[in-house]
Amino acid sequence: MMARALVQSTNILPSVAGERAGQFNGSRKDQRTVRMLCNVKCCSSRLNNFAGLRGCNALDTLLVKSGETLHSKVAAATFVRRPRGCRFVPKAMFERFTEKAIKVIMLAQEEARRLGHNFVGTEQILLGLIGEGTGIAAKVLKSMGINLKDARVEVEKIIGRGSGFIAVEIPFTPRAKRVLELSLEEARQLGHNYIGSEHLLLGLLREGEGVAARVLENLGADPTNIRTQVIRMVGESSEAVGASVGGGTSGLKMPTLEEYGTNLTKLAEEGKLDPVVGRQAQIERVTQILGRRTKNNPCLIGEPGVGKTAIAEGLAQRIANGDVPETIEGKKVITLDMGLLVAGTKYRGEFEERLKKLMEEIKQSDEIILFIDEVHTLIGAGAAEGAIDAANILKPALARGELQCIGATTLDEYRKHIEKDPALERRFQPVKVPEPSVDETIQILKGLRERYEIHHKLHYTDEAIEAAAKLSHQYISDRFLPDKAIDLIDEAGSRVRLRHAQLPEEARELEKELRQITKEKNEAVRGQDFEKAGELRDREMDLKAQISALIDKNKEKSKAESEAGDAAGPIVTEADIQHIVSSWTGIPVEKVSTDESDRLLKMEETLHTRVIGQDEAVKAISRAIRRARVGLKNPNRPIASFIFSGPTGVGKSELAKSLATYYFGSEEAMIRLDMSEFMERHTVSKLIGSPPGYVGYTEGGQLTEAVRRRPYTVVLFDEIEKAHPDVFNMMLQILEDGRLTDSKGRTVDFKNTLLIMTSNVGSSVIEKGGRRIGFDLDFDEKDSSYNRIKSLVTEELKQYFRPEFLNRLSEMIVFRQLTKLEVKEIADIMLKEVFVRLKNKEIELQVTERFRDRVVDEGYNPSYGARPLRRAIMRLLEDSMAEKMLAGEIKEGDSVIVDVDSDGNVTVLNGTSGAPSDSAPEPILV
């Protein structure tokens, strides 16, 4: 290898001569031209048994001047072996290429392969510039009407396709190398320390000859016009280029900042940023900190969605308007994309190199204010084993005031990351950003209204704006203003626009028919049935005309409606905002419709179809639901909280289930917690989640997670007296403030839940007092007896539960014992459930009055409520039916009558014989 290098070194003499000629002529050309571009011809001679290098070489005189040796010069170049005419470009030049410029060169090589050429010429570089697609050069060429397809055709016309062997490494032609040299010169003239796709295009235009120039000429592009457009897009005029060539620094560009940052001040000047309403105090404080001599780095700290980024945008808008003190006047706010900065840094040192370049550009400019959103990502960014992360690289500059940086992060992330690094924390001055009030949010929404109206092409009413702020504050508890209110008006606008953009039902049907006919027509053409295809085509044209007419009619109707309403397009009303809140949370906040009003007024009747008796409890629950639905309940407390006390089996849990079924949709809509599972002290943590370090910490609490997912529901704490006393302490804040903090520190909102606690405390008192309540007593005497029992039960509850717990409850309801008549009604409900199960098996069941009385007699027990009734039905009916079905006496499609004979035995009759028709009740269908 060294021998080959020695032989090849003799071929660099033309470059050496050029170097010396440049020195004698007083040229400013860099003495490193040899390093930047060489044309080496591989010598066909071979040296065998080479013993070593001589101490002196023809190049040594030149190389010593630049502090280099032949060894280092040869090592700096990358050689590619070729039979003859081997060309190469040293790596040092490509180090200055941007990623887009490197992509252009790679695409040029791909184009050469595609055309079968064993070289990369100016025409391939031109194709690469067009194909890159995103750079300045590609945009300029596209604006001139030059596309890749036409350019390829022109190239093939001029030079044709090759058919030779294509190697892995394709060399450059001398003219292509000249283009690369000229692109370097163009970059220097523009004051850039990099070579981008725009410089390659300028070099291509400056070369002026070759296939690429002919292609541009054939495509009708004016090279002078292209050059002007490129320089304009780069941000330089002809005069500025001349000034920078003359030694000025005004042409200095900041490629790293442009690549990894966004200029907020420029966006503000162009009016592309949303207006910032309020936040005057925070912007003033940020301005004060930026005016400091050292440690002039404000850090905006606040909850997610309170408007931290908006403060940086507000500062950029003030700078653009000139409404800032002279300390920061004329500066640019540039937001840095940390993800983009880290992306693609595969090798060690790449990230640090990017960051150092960025810092150098900021120091040179002295007019940059860097904004880093999510500033905690600095810590650990780019850090590999043995590497330094971004925070440690930035620390010295942040402390000395060389770098003005605005950070933004949440309270949690600030505590977790920045406070753990005191050296970084002291360099940032914290600026607290509180959540705005509802009134401030309304002002913010009114400021943003115009932008959203333009985007959605509709109009927002003042009522909708106010409803968005108020309803989001009341019902969406896990997010912060103004973010959640802005999301509400945005989604409501999207919903209304989609609703108005929908085609009429008739047009949708015609479109469906049109798709079918088009499909049939294509099949007919494939089957060469052209006569049928012609008929279908005529039908297709008719349908298209009909659909077009319907769409025009719909547009005219919408236009007339908007003109009648004096509004630009559809209108977003308060009802639309309410609908979005309901769809987000599941809480009905829309105005009560007529149907729902009737349902709420008849709620007692509805609940009584499943819960027999217990009028006091049913009325209390119905009142609470009505109060909540019309919006009269206390917004800071749950809908209601009850203790249902009474003997077992009288319908305490059943009432909660029936409420969940009839009003909340299904029994599963209820959150049921069996408090007998929380008898021990350590099990209490299951409600809110295990503490850190314990099993189940990541899963969340049984109560808190369920309520977070379904905030509008019934929460049933069954058998509350079985729970450990610590449970009651935890429930105090739920009952009073409607909130509970889980093990992860998140606040769960209970303001839209109905809390029901069942208890058997006082059942012995009810049993003793209940015996005196007979069937023949007057209503007044019944009520006085019930009131006496209620007072006794309340006293017993006070002995068992702490006063601060009982005092927070909405109501303590004592359930009565069931009478025999009520048990008979319950028997009908339970029998109906059996009928439904058999109906699913296609067996029709009827029971006689005698059998019903037998069930009630066996199942009635005042002390145990309705549960003995279920056992009686299971024993008398279900067991008898199961035996007959297994014996094959009852099959699908049979009609079965269950009766009791004179001896009191249950008889199951298949068919209608053996039982009088008047005694057999009609099957109860559900």
Curated annotation (Swiss-Prot):
First-listed, main subcellular location of the protein, grouped into a coarse class: plastid
Region (Repeat 1): 97-162
Domain UVR: 511-546
Subcellular location field: Plastid, Chloroplast
Clp R domain sequence ranges: 94-236
Gene Ontology MF: a single term: ATP hydrolysis activity
Chain positions covered by the region annotation I: 257-504
Pfam assignment, any one: AAA_lid_9
Entry superkingdom: Eukaryota
Residue numbers binding ATP: 302-309, 646-653
InterPro entries per the UniProt record, alphabetical: AAA+_ATPase, ATPase_AAA_core, Clp_ATPase_C, Clp_N_dom_sf, Clp_R_dom, ClpA/B, ClpA/B_CS1, ClpA/B_CS2
PROSITE patterns: CLP_R, CLPAB_1, CLPAB_2, UVR
SMART domains noted in UniProt: AAA, ClpB_D2-small
Record field: transmembrane: none
Stretch list, region Repeat 2: 172-236
II: region residues: 572-763
GO terms under cellular component: chloroplast
Keywords: ATP-binding, Chaperone, Chloroplast, Nucleotide-binding, Plastid, Repeat, Transit peptide
PANTHER family: ATP-DEPENDENT CLP PROTEASE (PTHR11638), CHAPERONE PROTEIN CLPC1, CHLOROPLASTIC-LIKE (PTHR11638:SF155)
Family: Belongs to the ClpA/ClpB family. ClpC subfamily.
Function of the protein: May interact with a ClpP-like protease involved in degradation of denatured proteins in the chloroplast.
Protein name: ATP-dependent Clp protease ATP-binding subunit ClpA homolog CD4A, chloroplastic
Species whose genome carries this gene: Solanum lycopersicum
Organismal lineage: Eukaryota, Viridiplantae, Streptophyta, Embryophyta, Tracheophyta
Originating gene: CD4A
